């Protein structure tokens, strides 16, 4: 415990009410967040002579300050605790790591919000629902939502430039907010709120609201509106009945856990309508001395209760470990969902088999992760010996990708002692250079990456430059010109030149842009690590380049079709609601566009399928 922290005086001020506490170290950093039914009793337990674990002893030694937030109920405390954990990422808490590759459904915060598939960082304003186990699950959900609640799914660029409604409006899959007068803002906002409630699992609230509106319309003799609302109610009821009836059509999340060598894997099976929709393995950060019960309990809380995104909630949650706060967690999740969601730990029959499957997958994924980390660590030790550089903590690698100078993209990948840090991978769109000038591209990406202040833990020990002596020389020139507060001599710059015929194992490494390089034996573990990092950077750059190139080319794909000029291209995109709906459209649907004959529609259809 910090000498500056007076525990006796502090405990005299603490209430016996429920609440959340935040512990700070001498640097004013939050190191632990906890919740308690009785704050005074819980906090007093940290300052006894005999503590429960070494982890707690290490935590208490660093306490310099404790802040307390009182809540009305223990459920409120639980929700607040997980929001604080999400915000502060304390090092003594079990942390569920975000994986930005998981697909989500995004509901924008525009005047007329749109629904879309989303991956990556959540920068745009709006609501995020998920994550979903795969992209197909998202697309199926979006298709269902479009039938139930007709709000737009078109790109903003299409929405802003329409003068007449698209095909989606004509088949009653969109209310047509793009054209003034087709729908008032109040009705559109109601449909958006229904989507928000539906994706949050609050189906009964949606039905209640629709029934109330139908009855009101009927009393006011607006029978056409009442009939439309009746049809919408029936559609929602059909879906929800399929989701939550017992037997072979249940919605369950099944959570299996494996714990070994200080690392945990939690595997979640997503079962929808009685079928395994998909699954994901999660590897939370686990502080030393943490128990399995604490790992699983914290995971369940963070997974379902953190407020940064709205998770699609099942009808039931199965876990393979009895949790101390199971009832509190179930009550909190149920309150969030607006319906009862039980948490079961001793299922029978098919549920028991699901749980066994989740547990088996958790063990398999954990063993694979441990094996991978062991291999990477062995290779890293060899690399430290080869480079005569001890305690390498962070490595970064850069590569450039383009096609004949078109749409140049640079990539940066990051590795630590455990392997790839994919959440820190970055791509940079290169602009303002002569097409095909790889040296200028490397110059630009390095300045954008490093010409700024960096936290100590973000300074790489090694920077690999894929491209040989020329690119290495460019990198050294950039670092010689940088004027930053951190030590630009700390990163070791290492060039990687591909061997003859670009065969793996024949690479030449360079410390300097002049003179001879050196090679490592093809079976060298150090070389294998370098190849792994280089290949990750190469693949990341190529993927980014192809995505950027496809985006540019897709807009001109129509103009390459004989008979399609700029005017017809614009007409097609406006009428269909964008490029993707046009790609998905049938020949008959394309032929409905004014000025497009059946023969031309067939030509467009097959050209876009190539």
Swiss-Prot record:
This is UvrABC system protein C. HAMAP family: UvrC. Coiled coil: none annotated. CDD domains: GIY-YIG_UvrC_Cho (cd10434). GO terms for molecular function: DNA binding; excinuclease ABC activity. Residues 16-94 form the GIY-YIG domain. It is found in: Cytoplasm. SUPFAM superfamilies: C-terminal UvrC-binding domain of UvrB, GIY-YIG endonuclease, RuvA domain 2-like. Belongs to the UvrC family. InterPro entries: GIY-YIG_endonuc (IPR000305), GIY-YIG_endonuc_sf (IPR035901), GIY-YIG_UvrC_Cho (IPR047296), Hlx-hairpin-Hlx_DNA-bd_motif (IPR003583), RuvA_2-like (IPR010994), UVR_dom (IPR001943), UVR_dom_sf (IPR036876), UvrABC_protein_C (IPR050066). GO terms for biological process: nucleotide-excision repair; SOS response. Keywords: Cytoplasm, DNA damage, DNA excision, DNA repair, Excision nuclease, SOS response. The gene is uvrC. It comes from the Bacteria.
């Amino acid at each position: 415990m910090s000498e500056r922290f007076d525990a006796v005086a502090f405990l005299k001020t603490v209430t016996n009410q429920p609440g959340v506490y935040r512990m700070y170290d001498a640097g004013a950093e939050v190191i632990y967040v906890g919740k308690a039914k009785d704050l005074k009793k819980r906090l007093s337990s940290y300052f006894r002579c005999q503590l429960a674990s070494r982890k707690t002893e290490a935590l208490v030694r660093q306490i310099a300050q404790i802040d307390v937030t009182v809540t009305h109920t223990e459920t409120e405390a639980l929700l607040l605790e997980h929001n604080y954990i999400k915000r502060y990422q304390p090092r003594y808490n079990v942390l569920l790591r975000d994986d930005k590759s998981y697909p989500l459904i995004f509901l924008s915060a525009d005047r007329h919000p749109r629904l879309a598939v989303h991956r990556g960082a959540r920068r745009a304003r709006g609501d995020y629902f998920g994550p979903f186990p795969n992209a197909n699950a998202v697309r199926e959900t979006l298709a269902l939502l479009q039938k139930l609640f007709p709000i737009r799914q078109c790109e903003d660029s299409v929405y802003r430039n329409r003068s007449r409604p698209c095909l989606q409006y004509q088949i009653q899959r969109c209310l047509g907010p793009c054209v003034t007068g087709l729908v008032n803002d109040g009705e559109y906002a109601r449909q958006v709120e229904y989507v928000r409630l539906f994706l949050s699992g609050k189906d009964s609230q949606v039905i209640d609201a629709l029934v109330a509106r139908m009855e009101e319309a009927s009393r006011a003799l607006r029978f056409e509106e009442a009939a439309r609302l009746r049809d919408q109610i029936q559609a929602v009821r059909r879906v929800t009945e399929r989701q939550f009836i017992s037997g072979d059509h249940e919605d369950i999340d099944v959570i299996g856990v494996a714990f070994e060598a200080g690392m945990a894997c939690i595997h979640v099976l997503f079962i929808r309508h009685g079928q395994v929709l998909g699954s994901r393995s999660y590897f939370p950060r686990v502080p030393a001395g943490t128990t399995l019960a604490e790992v699983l309990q914290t995971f369940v809380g963070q997974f379902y209760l953190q407020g940064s995104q709205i998770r699609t909630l099942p009808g039931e949650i199965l876990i393979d470990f009895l949790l101390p706060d199971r009832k509190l967690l179930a009550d909190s999740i149920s309150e969030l969902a607006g319906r009862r969601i039980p948490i079961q730990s001793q299922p029978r029959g098919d549920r028991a088999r699901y749980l066994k499957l989740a547990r088996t997958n958790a063990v398999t994924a954990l063993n694979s992760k441990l094996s991978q980390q062991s291999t990477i660590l062995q290779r890293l030790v060899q690399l430290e010996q080869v480079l005569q550089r001890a305690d390498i903590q962070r490595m970064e690698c850069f590569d450039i990708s383009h096609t004949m100078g078109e749409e140049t993209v640079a990539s940066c990948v990051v590795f630590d002692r455990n392997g790839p840090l994919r959440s820190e991978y970055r791509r940079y769109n290169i602009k303002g250079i002569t097409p095909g000038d790889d040296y200028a591209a490397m110059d630009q990406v390095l300045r954008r990456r490093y010409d700024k202040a960096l936290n100590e833990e973000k300074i790489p020990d090694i920077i690999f430059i894929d491209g040989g002596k020329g690119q290495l020389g460019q990198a050294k020139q950039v670092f010689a010109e940088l004027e930053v507060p951190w030590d630009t001599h700390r990163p070791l710059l290492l060039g990687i030149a591909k061997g003859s015929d670009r065969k793996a194992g024949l690479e030449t490494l360079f410390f300097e842009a002049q003179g001879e390089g050196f090679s490592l034996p093809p079976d060298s573990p150090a070389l294998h690590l370098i190849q792994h990092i280089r290949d990750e950077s190469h693949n990341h750059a190529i993927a980014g380049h192809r995505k950027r190139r496809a985006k540019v080319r897709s807009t001109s794909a129509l103009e390459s079709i004989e008979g399609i000029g700029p005017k017809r291209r614009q007409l097609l995109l406006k009428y269909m609601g964008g490029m993707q709906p046009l790609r998905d459209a049938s020949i008959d649907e394309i032929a409905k566009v004014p000025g497009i004959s059946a023969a031309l529609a067939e030509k467009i259809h097959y050209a876009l399928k190539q």
